[in-house]
Amino acid sequence: MIMKMLRTFLLLLTTLAFTNCLAQPFADEIHEFKKHDSIQFPPANAILFVGSSSFRKWQDVGKYFPGYTIINRGFGGSTLPDVIRYADDIIIPYHPKQVVIYCGDNDFAASDKVTADTVFERFKTLFDIIRSKLPGENILFVAIKPSPSRKRLWPKMKQANLLIKTYLSLQTNAHFIDIWPQMLNADGSGKRELFEPDMLHMKANGYAIWQKAIAPYLSK
């Protein structure tokens, strides 16, 4: 009788844990990553791209960086808290030689209460998690991009970028990659031709700009 009750209790705990996992944002995408990893785990010492949909949609990222082994773990319209939540699933296990982060865009879009300081503190949390579990890890942060559809958020994005840039300049083995100058017209407006019709996600010519900006910082 006791064993039967124990089995029932353990079954309930397992069910609750599974339900809670599925209730987490982007759980399906993370599950797919882990399923793929269980079939063929990526090689160690690769370069990991992680963050939001600007990386997720860069599905042919490996073709932009020939000679490098790239793992792409961009997912959904993720925010920095989402990347933090899943760091133990899609960052730490790979033991990459370098982590390239693009995130923060959706943090501002999610709520007007999110400030540049909010995003900065979230980034530092992610940075500290990576460095604590992968000591000395080479970390790159791609600037939050100037999407025309989110122009009202540009002032906060610029401030967050500056805070992150300043912070990374004081860290070892870390760099901030500024892509704003190449994505703006002479009058300061965003180059609409770089974007899909939603004026948020980029086309191939936008990613070509990112490739040129990122390539000099990639670890051989």
Language-model segments: residues:
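Conserved SGNH/GDSL esterase-like catalytic core that processes O-acyl groups on lipids
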Residues: Q24-K124, P148, L153-K158, L162
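Sec-exported extracytoplasmic/periplasmic mature domains
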Residues: D88, I92, G104, D128-P135, ...
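Alpha/beta-hydrolase-fold catalytic nucleophile elbow
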Residues: Y102, V142-A143
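Bacterial Sec-dependent N-terminal signal peptides
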Residues: M1-P25
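Charged, glycine-enriched surface loops/patches
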Residues: T118-V142, Q159, L163-A174
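Catalytic His-Asp segment of secreted/periplasmic serine-dependent ester chemistry enzymes
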Residues: P146-K220
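Active-site flanking residues adjacent to catalytic metal/cofactor-binding acidic residues
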Residues: V50-G51, V142, I177
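Conserved Rossmann-like nucleotide-binding pocket used by diverse enzymes
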Residues: A17, I71, L140, H175
